[in-house]
Amino acid sequence: MSRNIVKILDKGFSDISAGEKMLISSPEKISEFIFKIPKGSYLSIKSLRRELALKAGADNTCPVTTGIFLRMAIEQNKDDVKFPYWRVIDEKHPVVKKLKLDENQIKKRRVDEGIPS
């Protein structure tokens, strides 16, 4: 399901305050976003959450669902050599072990693009 849901929070949650708009994205939307990250660029998960939210008219993206959906997006696209997940995670990110990704390959791709570890 490739849709965004925006909710106004009654109570603060994580780094999102009460009254702010919180985006609940999807694996598909996160995949689309990662595909568009330019070569040589790195985006932290926090920055990814903020940018996804702003594009959807929200203040921030839910950190819990972002983690889940990021893992799903990487899992669904990990065999696509054009899917640049290494621009969002480094070889030390917990999802690397969960999905049995090649740490050395991630490191090499980041070095090749000039992305610091």
Q: Could you say what each language-model-derived stretch is?
A:
Residues 5-117:
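Nucleic acid-binding interface residues in structured DNA/RNA-binding domains
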